[in-house]
Amino acid sequence: MNDDQYSRAVPFYDLWHEDGHVPEIRESLPPLLKGVRGGVMEIGAGTGLITELIVRETRGEVFAVEPALAMRSVLLSRLAGDAEARRRVTVLACGALDVDVDVPVEAVVMISVLQAFPAGRREELWRVLARQLEPGGLLLFNWRERPAPTPGELELMGSYQVGRHAYEVWGQVLGVSGETVRSRFLYRVRQRGVVIGEDEVTSEAHRPGGERLAAELTAAGFVKDEAPDGLAAWRKAA
């Protein structure tokens, strides 16, 4: 999605993700961060839901990379009320392929971001992240092997009551080509059952298989590490 598309989704973002992958990540990520003493880079920090977790579970500097202004605005507002986060977190207004910090980090965390990168750009992504990591540094991202979805009708994915308004997220798979899934999303606001606001976003997600991912990461100089179901852990070769 581009920045304008993100701005349409932001009011729904925390509501939807708190009802999705975020609670699971709060359980599964901390054990993998337990031994991290140095800096951490978060790719695609979004509104800061996982940034908060990283701050709680680590003690070093945190670089929160978020290119979308709408997401970054919420992220900074979230950090504003936490003195410890304000001291340690640097928010970088760039994308993953453009990030360049002057100190190597001990870990890179990338939650619900991998699907934004088509096969042709992942090679560059792994190269950039390897450059940012210290030798032996840890790369963590969420991933599961899933069957390819099939195109279908528009479906309600979540509805969340906030005061008098219901915030609804609708989704529809439009087409699948290889690892690329093209989808349509509707973000609706209802009051007493009447739609009072609606925005539509069409986007592409890329879902590489496990063998393909392993080959890419191995070629980029990473070695697979242990991780719980739903997460992948790779280390930069020492």
Question: What is the predicted role of each segment?
Answer:
Residues 1-46:
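Conserved class I S-adenosyl-L-methionine
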Residues 136-143:
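Conserved beta-strand signature within the Rossmann-like core of class I S-adenosyl-L-methionine
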Residues 143-208:
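SAM-dependent methyltransferase
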